[in-house]
From Swiss-Prot:
It comes from the Bacteria. Pathway: Cell wall biogenesis; peptidoglycan biosynthesis. Its main location: cytoplasm. The lineage of its organism: Bacteria, Bacillati, Bacillota, Bacilli, Lactobacillales. Keywords: ATP-binding, Cell cycle, Cell division, Cell shape, Cell wall biogenesis/degradation, Cytoplasm, Ligase, Nucleotide-binding, Peptidoglycan synthesis. Pfam families: Mur_ligase, Mur_ligase_C, Mur_ligase_M. Gene3D superfamilies: Mur ligase, C-terminal domain, Mur-like, catalytic domain, NAD(P)-binding Rossmann-like Domain. This is UDP-N-acetylmuramate--L-alanine ligase. One of its GO terms (cellular component) is cytoplasm. The keyword Nuclease does not apply. PANTHER family: UDP-N-ACETYLMURAMATE--L-ALANINE LIGASE, UDP-N-ACETYLMURAMATE--L-ALANINE LIGASE-RELATED. NCBIfam families: murC. Cell wall formation. ATP binds at residues 110-116.
């Protein structure tokens, strides 16, 4: 029997994906959010899911209510009304923890690479067998007949603790979310607690000594480039068309693979997926076949070409992610100037990682910075400004605004890499409009 679900904060990346998945499984789905456009709403609108403005009038006792993790009674009128009336509701991660028990579940955790790896795993498995999935780019697929469920496990505020998957990949650990985690040890403890809940197999990046401290009742398989790992990527060829490599398990070759993706991090992500599916007994020939057709996930190295100008959009908002994205850009466009346009995301992260951001951005040939995008969870107390970051970058750097991105035109034969988790896409759109207007004026 179908239920009616109401999502408080339906435009959130995880929430929108879950809403789409439940909609495809035959349930009635609606939700509420702010009026501001967010990239996830396109998929919801295409599916015919109703998006309402926040209002207590949206709430009734017969609804199954799922609330986004950022919302509290003091900042959301709907949640305040739900609590006042004594209605039942679940947080996103609580609902997901219960929901996934009906499937064989495959989680992807890690400080970086979660969304890309989840997308790759879901793409391969859904093309082999009926699979439901939930990806952090706002994409979800639900099937009532699916045996498998692939999902992204978010470490922020330990939201992944309700999850008890059969299998999980852990791509890496790194210090991030300084508004919540106290340091790297706190991050490690969260991942270690999550790992203990995995039931049948853990697939962990093997070249980080800290990750070798993770313990679990489930068997642990390490993957990477070095011979000390269980699953090893070897004979790697990186070209402008992607990456080719072989994977060995216990020193025996299990297949040759190609991924149409760029950067060493994507070879590691693919190796993790291959390892997980190999241990599950999935045919490696089928895995190789479907790896070749992966087209990526939203806002992860998303490319477009406007009048011969290459523009890349990426969600990178941590120094490690910036380095990986710029490495990927250099692999695909080795003869072009790499121009980075970056919007720092949250004041707390910018303060905590200021030197690391400067080092990462200095891997580009030129850097342009947008004003810091503050989180709804914090206030700007003036401790850090984007100019502080600009002063530490060793390459040419400048500031841009949405109203004036014309300094970006001072480059020939360039690739423009827009990075950030805030509203960096507004800057990208502004640049695209500028290019379009220039073309019109020269015709």
């Amino acid at each position: 029997m179908s239920k009616t679900y109401h999502f408080i904060g339906i435009k959130g990346s995880g929430m929108s994906a879950l809403a789409l998945m439940l909609h495809q499984m035959g349930h009635n789905v609606q939700g509420s959010d702010v009026d501001k456009y967010y990239f996830t709403q396109r998929g919801l609108e295409q599916a015919g899911v109703t998006i309402l403005p926040f209002s207590p009038n949206n709430i009734s006792e017969d609804l199954e209510i799922i609330a986004g993790n950022a919302f509290r009674p003091d900042n959301n009128e709907e949640l305040a009304y739900v609590i006042e009336k004594g209605y039942q509701f679940k947080r996103y991660h609580e609902f997901l923890g219960d929901f996934m028990r009906q499937f064989t579940s495959l989680g992807v955790a890690g400080a970086h690479g979660k969304t890309s790896t989840t997308g790759l795993l879901a793409h391969v498995l859904k093309n082999i067998t009926d699979t439901s999935f939930l990806i952090g780019d706002g994409t979800g697929r639900g099937s009532a007949n699916a045996n498998y469920f692939v999902f992204e496990a978010d470490e922020y505020e330990r939201h992944f603790m309700p999850y008890h998957p059969e299998y999980s990949i852990i791509t890496n650990i790194d210090f991030d979310h300084p508004d919540y985690f106290t340091g790297l040890e706190d991050v490690f403890n969260a991942f270690n607690d999550y790992a203990k809940q995995v039931q049948k197999g853990l697939f962990i990046y093997g070249e980080d000594p800290k990750l070798h401290e993770i313990t679990s009742e489930a068997p642990i398989y390490y993957y990477g480039f070095e011979d000390s790992n269980d699953f090893i990527a070897k004979d790697i060829t990186r070209t402008v068309n992607g990456s080719d490599f072989k994977v060995f398990y216990n020193q025996e070759e299990i297949g040759q693979f190609h991924v149409p993706a760029y950067g060493k991090h994507n070879i590691l992500n693919a190796t993790a997926v291959i390892a997980n599916l190999y241990i599950m007994g999935i045919d490696m020939a089928l895995v190789a076949e479907h790896l070749k057709t992966f087209s990526g996930v939203k806002r992860r190295f998303t490319e477009k070409i406007i009048d011969d100008t290459v523009i890349i959009d990426d969600f990178a908002h941590h120094p490690t992610e910036i380095i990986a994205t710029l490495d990927a850009a250099r692999q695909k466009y080795p003869s072009k100037e790499i121009v980075a346009i970056f919007q720092p995301h949250t004041f707390t992260r910018t303060i905590a990682l200021l030197d690391e951001f400067a080092h990462a951005l200095s891997q580009a040939d030129s850097v342009y910075l947008a004003q810091i995008y503050g989180s709804a969870r914090e206030v700007d107390n003036g401790e850090v400004k984007v100019e502080d970051l600009a002063a530490k970058i060793v390459k040419h750097s400048d500031l841009v605004t949405v109203e004036n991105v014309s300094p970006l035109l001072n480059h020939d034969n360039a690739v423009y890499v827009f990075m950030g988790a805030g509203d960096i896409q507004l800057y990208e759109r502004s640049f695209e409009e500028l290019l379009a207007n220039l073309t019109k004026n020269t015709q």
